[in-house]
Amino acid sequence: MKTIRLTTAQALVKFLNQQYVEFDGHIQKFVKGIFTIFGHGNVLGLGQALEEDPGELEVYQGRNEQGMAHAAIAFAKQKHRRQIMACTSSVGPGAANMVTAAATASANHIPVLLLPGDTFATRQPDPVLQQIEHWHDLTVSTNDAFRAVSKYWDRISRPEQLMSAMIQAMRVLTDPANTGAVTIALPQDVQGEAYDFPESFFQKRIHRIERRVPAKAAIHEAVELIRRKKKPIIICGGGVRYSEAAEELKQFAEKFHIPYGETQAGKSAVESAHPYNLGGIGVTGNLAANIIAKEADLVIGIGTRYTDFTTGSKQLFQHPEVEFLTINVSVFDACKLDAVRVVADAKLALLALTEELEKIGYRSGYTNEIDIAKKAWEEELNRLHHVRYRQSGFQPEVAGHLDEVLTEYSEFFDSSLTQTEVIGAINEWIDDDAIIIGAAGSLPGDLQRMWVARRPNTYHMEYGYSCMGYEIAGALGVKMAEPDKEVYAMVGDGSYLMLHSELVTSIQEKKKINVLLFDNGGFGCINNLQMGHGMGSFATEFRYRNEETGRLDGSLIPIDFAQSAAGYGVKTYKVHTLEQLKEALEDAKQQSVSTLIDIKVLPKTMTHDYESWWHVGVAEVSRNPKIAEAYKRKEQQLQRARKY
C-alpha cells in the first residue's frame, strides 16, 4: 500500500480537494472553499496546511464565527445543497459561536462542514487557554455542545481516525434526507501530528446524489387516496426546489386542477404568477392560500417538514375528513400528521403520480373557488401597497397596541412610511432576477405574504431556525453563489444589531450586497406577540430607561444605522419618503461596493393574521384580565387543532 506522510490538517485539506458530487449526470467540485477565523486552536495546524497547499480551496476571512458559518449555509442553500463551504474556528468561544449556525443548518437540512479547533488530545498543558474543565469528565470540551445541533459529530483524537470520520462526514453532507451540520472537532495537537496516510484516501471521490424512486405500492396508495378527494391542496416545500421539480409541479397542478400554497423554503420554486400558485400558506400565509386550505379535504405536502407555521399549529386544515399525503425523501418527515407517505424524490414522485392519475381521468372538484380566493388576495395586496399614514384617523394593520404613540414615532423618525407600502415599492423597483434574503422578525411574514417572485429561486428565507443575524451574512453567501445577481438583505433593526459583521467581509471580497434595513424602533414582531396576548409593551421597544418608573419606557433611542455602516466603507442612504427610497434603490444598483439603505418605518404597519392561528404558551394564571382572556382564547383554538 502506497502512503504519503502528512499532518492530520494537511491530509484533511488534501481530502476535501478531491470531493465531487454528481446530480443528474452533472459532476462538480463539492467543497468550494473554507471560511476561517484563526486562533491558537487552529492557526498552526489547519492554518499551516491551508497556507502551504490549499489546492483549489478558496480561503475566506470571516469576522464572526456565527456570521461566516451562516454565509456558508446560505451559499449551500442557494446552490441547492450541491456545493458547500467549510468553516474553521479556534477553541472555546470561537467554536461556541458556531453552535447557533450549526443549529440553523440542521434545522433547515442544509449541509455545512464545521471544523472547530479543540483542546489537546494529550491533555499535557491542561487547562489550555479557553478550555472548560469538567471535573466529572475530562473528555468533554466546548465542542460537545455541537452534538445536539449536528447531524454528524466526531472528534479526531488520533490522525488515523480522520479517514473513517471524513467518509462518514461526506455521507451526511451529500444525503438529501439527512443532511445538516457536520462537526469534526480537531484537537490542536492532533492537527499537527504526522501519519502515513494511504494514497487511496486521497483519490477523487464522486458522491452521487441519487433521486429516490417511489415504490409502486406507495404510488398506488396515493392515487387511491387522491381519487376519493374533491378539494386537494398542495404544499410546495423546499424539497421542490432542491429536487428541481418546479415544472413537474406546475404540470401536475394544471392537469388535475389542484392549487398549491408555498412554505418559506418553497417560495419562488415556481414564479408567483402561475395560475395555481396561491402564495404563502400558514401562520405567515396570505388570504388566498389559507382560505383554500381551510376547506381542503386532502393536503399533499411535497418536500415540507410541516412546521407549526405551515400547519397553523395543526389547526389550519378544518375539513372534517381532511387527510394527508406526503412526498418526501425523509421518512421522518413523511410520517408526520399520520400521512399516507411516498418516500421518494419530489420530481420522480410527481411524474409517477401524474401518469397514474391521467389513467383514471382525475380532476379536482373545484369550480371557481381558486379564482375567487386569488382575486380576494390581489385586492388585499393592492390595499397593502397603498397604506399611507396620516395623523388623524389612521388605523394601523396591527391595531389596538401602540396607536397612541404612532405620532411620537412619526415625529421621531421624521417619516410616515408604512412597512407594507415600502415592501410593495421595493418589489416593484428592484430587478426581477434580484434575490432577497430574510430570516427573522416581522419581515418574513410580510415577505411570504406580499412578495411577488417573478423569477425562480429569487426568494431566500431562513425560517427553519429563524435566526436573527442571518440576513446580512446570508446575503454574502448568496452573492458568492450568484455573483452576477443583485442581492438584497431584508433586515430589521433588531436583527441588524444582533449581527452584521460580515458586511466587512463583503467589502474585503468585493462581493457587493445591498442591505435594506427596516428601522421601526424595536423588536416589533415580539411586541405584536406580547400585546396580542394581553401584555403591555414590555422591553421590546428601543427606549431609554425611565428614572421615574425604573422601566424601559422612556424616550426612543436614536440610532443612525447609515452612519454605522458607513464606517465600514459601505455606501449608505437615509430614507424617509418613497421618493427617497426609489432614488436610493436606483443609485445602489450602480454601486460596486456594498450598500445600506436605512428605511424608517412606523411600527404596527406590517401585515397581520389571515385566517390562521399560532399556538404559543400563555400564562394560565395572571392578575391581568387581558392575559386571562388570551389564555381562554388559546384553549378554545386548541380544541380545533389536531392532537398529533
UniProtKB/Swiss-Prot annotation:
The keyword Magnesium is annotated on this UniProt entry: yes
Entry's Gene Ontology cellular component terms: acetolactate synthase complex
The reaction(s) this protein catalyses: 3D-3,5/4-trihydroxycyclohexane-1,2-dione + H2O = 5-deoxy-D-glucuronate + H(+)
Residue ranges crossing the lipid bilayer per the database entry: none
Cofactor: Mg(2+); thiamine diphosphate
Enzyme type, top EC level: hydrolase
Enzyme Commission designation: 3.7.1.22
CDD domains, per the entry: TPP_IolD, TPP_PYR_POX_like
Any GO molecular function: acetolactate synthase activity
Keyword entries, A-Z: Hydrolase, Magnesium, Metal-binding, NAD, Thiamine pyrophosphate
SUPFAM superfamilies membership: DHS-like NAD/FAD-binding domain, Thiamin diphosphate-binding fold (THDP-binding)
Gene3D superfamilies: 3.40.50.970, TPP-binding domain (3.40.50.1220)
Function: Involved in the cleavage of the C1-C2 bond of 3D-(3,5/4)-trihydroxycyclohexane-1,2-dione (THcHDO) to yield 5-deoxy-glucuronate (5DG).
Family matches, as HAMAP family: IolD (MF_01669)
Protein name per Swiss-Prot or TrEMBL: 3D-(3,5/4)-trihydroxycyclohexane-1,2-dione hydrolase
Species the sequence originates in: Geobacillus kaustophilus (strain HTA426)
